[in-house]
Amino acid sequence: LTDFHIIVINDGSGKDKLPIFAEAAKKAIVLTHEVNKGKGRGIKTALEYIKEHESDTVGIIIADADGQHKVEDIIRVSEALKSSPDKLIMGCRRFSGKIPLRSKFGNNITKFVFSFAAGVKVSDTQTGLRGFSSKLIPFMLSVNGDRYEFEMNMLLECAREGIRFYEVPIETVYLGKNESSHFNPI
């Protein structure tokens, strides 16, 4: 991954996790929130850092750190971004085979709501693997939300602004019974 500058967000993790971030800092920029501020705020912190310190950046890839995204898929999203820099690139999982019920349920509900609200069909609204041009940083920073709602708001705002979506099929990875996901259907 020599062409990538990696930014890791420590979003208020406990002291017991500090060795993980110290190890990450050997190969990445680690930005820290002293208290948990939410996924959306973490993404915005990274975007603000890029805007201020990495002005030569051409594109941004966002990947969750929950073990559900393979390096190969991150690279495929990056390649799609190079060929379609005017679109929001989404690494979309194919929900077939043994998929945890809460994942299938959650994605089906949000797909329906998003399609109804935005008039655009997306196969995986909950994907944490996305890419976009650095030209969109100011726009992304203006999207409302500091927690998980930021990602859905990002999709809604992109649809409203006429930013098209480009889906890249990615492998569906679940660890255990999907304990790494924080989606709660109730």
Language model segments and positions:
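Short loop->beta transition adjacent to catalytic acidic/histidine clusters or analogous donor-positioning motifs
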Residues: L1-I7, A28-I29, V58
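Conserved beta-strand segments of alpha/beta enzyme cores
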Residues: H5, I29-V30, K121, R164-Y166
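A conserved acidic beta->alpha catalytic loop
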Residues: N10-L18, G67
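Hydrophobic helical membrane-anchoring modules
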Residues: E23, V143-I186
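Acceptor/aglycone-binding surface of glycosyltransferases and processive sugar-polymer synthases
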Residues: I29, E34-K37, R41-Y49, V71-Y148, ...
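Residue-level signature of catalytic and energy-coupling elements of molecular machines
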Residues: A46, D66, S133, C158, ...
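Short, high-confidence coil segments that cap the C-terminus of an alpha-helix
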Residues: S55-T57, S84-L88, I163
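Short beta-strand-to-loop acidic/aromatic patch adjacent to the donor-nucleotide binding site
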Residues: D56-Q68
